[in-house]
């Protein structure tokens, strides 16, 4: 009987700790720490969108520096950022390796996003 009661207490303690300290059910991007919509970075990046979960109602958008196999540090994007809108057009949660370049012949501030590779 003590063994069953002890196992029950341990499992309840674990579930409480998991609920309080688990981060996968929370939003990864805090509202104040997002790349503003007017900030455009040029270069080779990984873009990724994660659908909202049970505790995060909105989609979250990420830009990872370094276009190689290893991702560099990640940056959260605003939902109104042009890169976030580019990801919304694809409507999936795949990783996109893209090259962002400036296109002065199209006008001031115009950019082109060229798809380099995909990863599930």
From Swiss-Prot:
Q: Which GO terms describe its cellular component?
A: extracellular region
Keyword set includes Membrane: no
Q: Name one GO molecular function term.
A: chemokine activity
What Gene3D superfamilies does the record tag this protein with? 2.40.50.40
Q: Name one GO biological process term.
A: immune response
Matching InterPro entries, A to Z?
Interleukin_8-like_sf
Domain of life assignment: Viruses
Q: Which UniProt keywords apply?
A: Host-virus interaction, Inhibition of host chemokines by virus, Viral immunoevasion
Query: Key word Kinase present in the record?
Result: no
Main function: Acts as a functional chemokine, inducing calcium mobilization, chemotaxis, and degranulation of neutrophils. Contributes to the induction of neutrophil chemotaxis by interacting with host CXCR1 and CXCR2 receptors.
Per UniProt, subunit arrangement is: Interacts with host CXCR1 and CXCR2.
| Protein family membership | Belongs to the intercrine alpha (chemokine CxC) family.
Protein name, UniProt field: Chemokine vCXCL1
Gene name of this polypeptide = UL146
